[in-house]
Curated annotation (Swiss-Prot):
GO terms for biological process: protein folding. GO terms for molecular function: adenyl-nucleotide exchange factor activity; protein homodimerization activity; protein-folding chaperone binding; unfolded protein binding. SUPFAM superfamilies: Coiled-coil domain of nucleotide exchange factor GrpE, Head domain of nucleotide exchange factor GrpE. The gene is grpE. It holds the Pfam family GrpE. Keywords: Chaperone, Cytoplasm, Stress response. It comes from Glaesserella parasuis serovar 5 (strain SH0165). This is Protein GrpE. Transmembrane segments: none annotated. It is found in: Cytoplasm.
Length: 199
């Protein structure tokens, strides 16, 4: 074969290679375009899914906050109700405090009267004793209790120490003499006992 044939052969090979390259490029372009189209279609879908997940998380957080607010509100209402009940109970319990304090003066006077009645007619003395017992019993029925007994341990919440002195037969820091009885109303001190304490 001649140079011309070789030349034709080379031209033919180049032409074939060019055609193959063009076909390959077209095929590649056709393969890439659907991928790009799919990627473009997936991106909005993925964005929508991400947005839905974001909104679901926001709604879950909002529900959690709302439940927390409701729980706190219920607890606050319960606390207010309980405090109101306690206030009413205390008001009922301690409504008699002023009256009880005034009645303690009467009890003290009856006790002093009983001490002064030594050697007086027994019928008068027993009448005063019965009056004293009746009054003390009535006060006890309403929650008023006497505190401060000789030999009892000194308690600064219930007793007011006037002085300390040595006392035979009584332990240190125990009441040796009761100068004036103390009283509590449902456990609350309405008048401390005035006492002398053994040293």
């Amino acid at each position: 074969m001649t140079n011309q044939t070789e030349k034709e052969q080379v031209e033919q090979d180049v032409s074939q290679a060019t055609e193959l390259a063009q076909e390959a490029q077209e095929a590649q372009t056709q393969d890439v375009e659907p991928e790009l189209q799919q990627n473009n279609e997936i991106d909005p879908l993925e964005e929508a899914i991400a947005r839905v997940q974001e909104l679901e998380a926001y709604i879950a957080e909002a529900d959690k906050r709302e439940q927390d607010i409701q729980l706190r509100a219920r607890a606050e209402v319960e606390n207010i109700r309980r405090r109101a009940e306690q206030d009413v109970e205390k008001a009922h319990k301690f409504a008699l405090e002023k009256f009880s304090k005034e009645m303690l003066t009467v009890v003290d006077n009856l006790e002093r009267g009983l001490q002064a009645l030594e050697g007086v007619d027994e019928s008068v003395k027993s009448g005063v004793e019965l009056t004293h017992k009746g009054l003390v019993s009535t006060l006890n029925n309403f929650g008023v209790e006497a505190v401060g007994v000789v030999g009892e341990a000194f308690n600064p919440e219930l007793h007011q120490a006037i002085s300390m002195q040595p006392a035979e037969g009584i332990e240190a820091n125990h009441i040796s003499v009761v100068l004036q009885k103390g009283y509590t109303l449902h456990g609350r001190v309405i008048r401390p006992a005035m006492v002398m304490v053994a040293s």
